[in-house]
Amino acid sequence: VKYLFVHQNFPGQFLHLVRHLVEARAHDIVFITEENRNHIEGVRKVPYARPRPPSPEVHWTVREFDGAMRRAEAVADTARQLKRLGYEPDIVIGHHGWGELLNLTDVWPGVPLLGYMEFFYHTHDYDVGFDPEFKSAPGDFPRIRAKNAVNLQALQLEAHGQTPTRWQLSTYPEWARPGITVLPEGVNLDVCKPNPALRRKPVRIGEWEIGPKDKLVTYVARDLEPYRGAHVMIRALPHLLKRRDVRVVMVGGDGVSYGAAPEGTTWRKMFMAELGAGFDASRVLFPGRVDYNTYLRLLQRSDVHVYLTYPFVASWSLREALATGCAVIGSDTPPVAEFVSHGRNG
C-alpha cells in the first residue's frame, strides 16, 4: 500500500503507526512535512517550506486561518510536484489542525483521505471559562469561533475523520460525528512499562539523586501553565513537602502552549512567588523540558504522578504514566475520566 502522511512536525501523532507500517516491510511510506531532524528508517520525507506569517493587515481573529490556508497551498504545491513525478498514493493520512490537508482532494480526487480531528472549539462549557481564576473576556469569543474555520472546511471534504477519544468526538457538532471514527492512540508497551529495579537503587535526574526511600511525586507538561494545572500543583507544594521524605519533580518549559503568558514574567515564577520568600524549594526540581529517556525514567520511578488539565485534549504523558504503572492523581475533568477510573487506576 502507498501511504502518504502529512503533518507539519514529522512524525507527530503518527509515530507508532508509521513504525508499525515500516516493520511490516510491505508498504511504501511518504511523509510531507516541514523540515526537521527527526528520522525513521524506511520513510521518505518530502519537505515543504513554512509559509510566511500573515500580514498585519489580516484581521486578528482570522490570522490562524490565513496561516492554515497558506499551509494548505504549500502542501498542495508539494503534492503536485510528487504527482508530476508519477506518485499516486492509495491513501492520505494527516492532521487537520494546521490546514495542510484542505487542498489535497483537488490534487488526488478519489483517493481516500483520513484526517485527524483533534478538537472543536467552544466559547463555553469546555476549556474556555472553565477556570474561574482566569476568565476569558467576551472579546476573545470571535477569535475562538474563528479557530473552527479549518475544522469546518475539513468537515466539508469528501473524506473521513478520526479522533483518539470519545470525549474529543463529543466536542464536534452532532451532525459531524457520523463522519468521524474514534481510533484510540496506543502506547508502546515494550518501552512504556514498569521498571521495579529503579525503586531499589538511587536514580539520578540532572543534579538530583533520588534514593530508594524517597517518595517521588512527578508532574509533566509541555509548559508549566494553567491549562495543565501548574498553578494547582505549585500551590500544593507546601502541603506535599510537609512529609520530609517527599521530593517533587515538575517537568515542563516556561513557554506558553495554550492561552497567553502573564505580563513580564512566566507562569512558574508567578505562582512560585505566591509561596513567599520563606518557602524552601530545595526538594522541588524544575528541570525544564527533558529528553524522552529521562522523562520515561521519571515515570517509572514515580511514586505518585499528578496529571491536571482543563477540559481539553488529554496529553500523551497521561497514557504513558498509566502504562508505566504510575499511581495517577488526575483532575476530575471529562478527558481524564476516559482514562482514569477512580479507585481502580487512579
What kind of feature is each model-predicted range?
Residues 1-44, 162, 240-242:
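N-terminal subdomain of nucleotide-sugar transferases
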Residues 52-62, 110-149, 190-202, 211-212, ...:
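Acceptor-binding helix/loop patch of EC 2.4 sugar-transfer enzymes
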Residues 159, 297-313, 326:
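Acidic donor-binding loop of glycosyltransferase active sites
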Residues 165, 221, 306-310:
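Short Ser/Thr-rich beta->loop micro-motif in glycosyltransferases that lines
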Residues 167, 186:
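Carbohydrate-associated surface elements
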Residues 203-228, 234-238, 248-249:
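Conserved donor-binding/catalytic core segment of Leloir-type glycosyltransferases
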Residues 256, 262-293:
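Nucleotide-activated donor-binding/catalytic signature segment of Leloir-type glycosyltransferases, i.e.
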Residues 333-343:
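Short acidic/histidine- and often glycine-rich active-site loop of Leloir-type glycosyltransferases
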